[in-house]
């Protein structure tokens, strides 16, 4: 394969995953990005994929250009050079929509839970049959012989509209991305348009009132916890090692399952995967076998222990996701104090969901807040401050800085849950260094 793909913005989570997948399929891959370290670049470096600085010299006749969605003529020299000199390029989602047509494709969409569900589906399928996949945590796997392709479908700016998958899961519909969507009706409209493009089977959460209204040309299967769902999770036992449950379909139990994951939402994610694979003709015994070994995806309830202290890192940046993450923490650590450290992501989302954020964070035993992380797409007009959120939480909520996370030490028998989509990991790293330094001075 002589073609070289050049990724403009290769460190983006979707872009890095796609680059890895194409590399593993035998294509030549390179990319450019800013110098700042991003967690996705480790996989790229391990694969030997060149990461170059942004430079118009990277744009040559012998490369096919794939551009990250955030990059435009006015903010990127490579895009500007390509447009000026007549080089064509595809956006990530445009390329993917065309590329996936050579496979039987399985999409995962939804306001929340996309990445975890895509991870669970791809893990199960790759252990049963040759499968390529793209996950939103920056993970990708490619095989030149794969018949199946699993991917995460992002609703932001309706990026999923070039996709026409054979099957798709939609985990839920919720109001998010207020910088783009105008209302919940606007969000619903986007998902409804996407659903109409699914070809063989659509799997949606049955207790979501919006998803009950969704329409598709493909058969629609509802999953959930209720008798009127086509696939119902039942006999649920939640323990400190995960969740056990059975799935009922057409009045029959189709299997008993265990997932080493926590929280009600992960039972739903697994039920969606089971329903999809059942309809697609996969052996339920094999599905059950491989669900047991799922180790999770990056930045979704990722745990580490530093100096005997449990630290959880999670991408949760919406009230619904915060509630789910704290529920998972309580399931695994029922006797521990749950300390939440949350960084709001974008000023527009913080303004739109301020009361909901406060209500969600009330589920923690103690709350700390980091300064709002503004998106590159917006300007801080001073309309909201993190102190506004702190004032609405029904317990003292202190604001911490990267330079001083020592207030977190005021807890015994606690686990620390760091949540956010910005640079909350800097706060987490600072806390880890503080714990390590205390250990060395004991």
From Swiss-Prot:
It catalyses: UDP-N-acetyl-alpha-D-muramate + L-alanine + ATP = UDP-N-acetyl-alpha-D-muramoyl-L-alanine + ADP + phosphate + H(+). Pathway: Cell wall biogenesis; peptidoglycan biosynthesis. The keyword ATP-binding applies. SUPFAM superfamilies: MurCD N-terminal domain, MurD-like peptide ligases, catalytic domain, MurD-like peptide ligases, peptide-binding domain. ATP binds at residues 110-116. Its EC number is 6.3.2.8. The keyword Transmembrane does not apply. It is an enzyme of class 6 (ligase). It is found in: Cytoplasm. GO terms for cellular component: cytoplasm. It comes from the Bacteria. GO terms for molecular function: ATP binding; UDP-N-acetylmuramate-L-alanine ligase activity. It holds the Pfam family Mur_ligase. Keywords: ATP-binding, Cell cycle, Cell division, Cell shape, Cell wall biogenesis/degradation, Cytoplasm, Ligase, Nucleotide-binding, Peptidoglycan synthesis. GO terms for biological process: cell division; cell wall organization; peptidoglycan biosynthetic process; regulation of cell shape. This is UDP-N-acetylmuramate--L-alanine ligase. The lineage of its organism: Bacteria, Bacillati, Bacillota, Bacilli, Lactobacillales.
């Amino acid at each position: 394969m002589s073609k070289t793909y050049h990724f403009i913005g290769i460190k983006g989570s979707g872009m890095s995953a796609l680059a890895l997948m194409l590399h593993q399929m035998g294509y030549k891959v390179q990319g450019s990005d800013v110098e700042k370290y991003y967690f996705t670049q480790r996989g790229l470096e391990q694969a030997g994929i060149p990461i170059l600085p942004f430079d118009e010299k990277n744009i040559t006749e012998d490369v096919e250009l794939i551009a990250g969605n955030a990059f435009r003529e006015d903010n990127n020299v490579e895009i500007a050079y390509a447009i000026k000199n007549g080089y064509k390029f595809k956006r990530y989602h445009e390329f993917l929509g065309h590329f996936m047509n050579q496979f039987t494709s399985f999409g995962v969409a939804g306001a929340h839970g996309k990445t975890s569900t895509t991870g669970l589906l791809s893990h199960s399928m790759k252990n049963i049959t040759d499968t390529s996949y793209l996950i939103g945590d920056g993970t990708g796997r490619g095989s030149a012989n794969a018949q199946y392709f699993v991917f995460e479908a992002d609703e932001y700016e309706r990026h999923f509209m070039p996709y026409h998958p054979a099957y798709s899961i939609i985990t839920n519909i919720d109001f998010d991305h207020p910088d783009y969507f105008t209302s919940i009706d606007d969000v619903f409209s986007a998902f409804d348009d996407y659903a109409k493009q699914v070809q063989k089977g659509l799997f949606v959460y049955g207790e979501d009132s919006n998803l009950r209204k969704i329409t598709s040309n493909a058969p629609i299967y509802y999953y959930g916890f209720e008798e009127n769902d086509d696939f119902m999770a039942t006999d649920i036992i939640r323990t400190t090692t995960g969740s056990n449950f059975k799935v009922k379909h057409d009045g029959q139990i189709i299997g008993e399952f265990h997932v080493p994951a926590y929280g009600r939402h992960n039972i739903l994610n697994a039920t969606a995967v089971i329903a999809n694979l059942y309809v697609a003709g996969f052996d339920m015994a094999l599905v059950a076998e491989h669900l047991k070994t799922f180790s999770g995806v990056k930045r979704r309830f990722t745990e580490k222990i530093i100096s005997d202290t449990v630290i959880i890192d999670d991408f949760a940046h919406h009230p619904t996701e915060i509630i789910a993450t704290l529920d998972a923490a309580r399931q695994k650590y029922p006797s521990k104090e749950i300390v939440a450290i949350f960084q709001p992501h974008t000023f527009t989302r913080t303004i739109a969901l301020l009361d909901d954020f406060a209500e969600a964070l009330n589920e923690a035993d103690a709350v700390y807040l980091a300064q709002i992380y503004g998106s590159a797409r917006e300007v801080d007009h001073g309309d909201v401050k993190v102190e506004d959120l702190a004032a609405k939480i029904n317990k003292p909520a202190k604001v911490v800085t990267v330079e001083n996370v020592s207030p977190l030490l005021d807890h015994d028998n606690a686990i620390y849950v760091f949540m956010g989509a910005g640079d909350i990991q800097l706060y987490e790293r600072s806390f880890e260094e503080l714990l390590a330094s205390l250990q060395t001075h004991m």
